[in-house]
């Protein structure tokens, strides 16, 4: 298996959404995960939206973002047929490297409760669980 990591492009959009569905990630194609939103995000996060490709087939994604002081790992997903083969680890490391090049010294991620494989990946990669934090949000658009 010769999986390569490369920046995602707009032409990958349909494959990204299909991969997220196969891997069980919730997606919001009507709004924040729409093609238009994805295009805007690609421009804003140049070099941080990465895909794992087996030949031309998209088998994994990781979306790196930052607020100029902290990096974020988002949407780390691997096709179920490619899980437990190191693809997630390679995507995580590639994202860390890309964020470090942007000057990020701290990288964080939100992991859905009950997602033990993802939590284990981050633990094995040196991430610490921060128990004193609580995630809060406010939807300015109820469909967001």
Feature map (PLM): residue ranges:
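Conserved GNAT acetyl-CoA-binding A-motif
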Residues: 92, 99-111
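Conserved beta-strand-loop-alpha-helix junction that forms the acyl-donor binding cleft
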Residues: 83, 109-118
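Short phosphate-binding/catalytic loops that engage adenosine nucleotides
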Residues: 87, 104, 127
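Short, conserved catalytic or interaction motifs in soluble domains
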Residues: 78
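Conserved acetyl-CoA-binding loop-helix of GNAT-fold acetyltransferases
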Residues: 84-97, 124
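Short acidic, glycine/proline-enriched helix-loop-strand junctions
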Residues: 117-129
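Extreme N-terminal starter segment of soluble prokaryotic enzymes
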Residues: 2-4
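Acetyl-CoA-dependent GNAT
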Residues: 7-75, 98, 129-141
